[in-house]
C-alpha cells in the first residue's frame, strides 16, 4: 500500500481562500491519491506592523535563500506542524511563507493568488485566473 501524501494546508482563516485550498485537496483525492491533511494556522508575528511585514516578506520572496527564508519565517506566527510532502495555500499574504517552507523542507508547493513580487518558477504549481507566466507550472482555466 502506498504511503499517504502529507499535505500542509496553510490558513489565515479566510473562508474563500480555505475553500480554494480544499478544492485542490479534493482534486488530489479524486485522482486516487491517499492524503493526510494538516491545517496550519498562520498569522503575522507582530500584528500592529503587519503592513510592514507584508512588504518585507514580499520583497524577500523574490530571492529565496537561507537568509531570506529565515527572515520570512520570523515575520509569521505559525501553529506547530508535522512533516509534509506538499504545502498548499491561497491568498497573497501566504505566498512568501509557502515558498519559504517549501524551500526549507524541500517539499512541493501549490499556491493560488494573483502574482506579486515572487517568481512563479519558485512554486511547483501556481494557480491563477489568467496567464501570468509562460512557465508550465502556471495553471489556469
Where are these regions (language model features)?
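Active-site and donor-binding regions of nucleotide-sugar-utilizing enzymes
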Residues: 9, 14-31, 37-138
Amino acid at each position: 500500500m502506498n504511503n499517504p501524501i502529507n499535505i500542509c494546508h496553510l490558513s489565515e482563516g479566510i473562508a474563500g481562500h480555505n475553500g480554494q485550498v480544499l478544492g485542490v485537496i479534493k482534486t488530489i483525492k479524486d485522482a486516487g491519491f491517499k492524503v493526510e491533511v494538516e491545517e496550519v494556522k498562520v498569522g503575522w508575528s507582530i500584528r500592529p506592523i503587519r503592513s510592514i511585514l507584508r512588504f518585507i516578506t514580499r520583497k524577500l520572496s523574490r530571492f529565496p535563500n537561507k537568509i531570506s527564508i529565515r527572515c520570512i519565517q520570523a515575520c509569521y506566527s505559525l501553529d506547530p506542524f508535522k512533516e509534509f510532502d506538499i504545502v498548499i495555500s491561497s491568498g497573497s499574504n501566504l505566498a512568501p511563507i509557502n515558498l519559504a517552507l517549501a524551500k526549507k523542507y524541500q517539499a512541493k508547493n501549490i499556491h493560488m493568488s494573483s502574482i506579486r513580487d515572487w517568481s512563479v518558477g519558485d512554486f511547483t504549481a501556481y494557480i491563477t485566473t489568467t496567464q501570468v507566466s509562460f512557465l508550465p507550472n502556471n495553471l489556469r482555466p
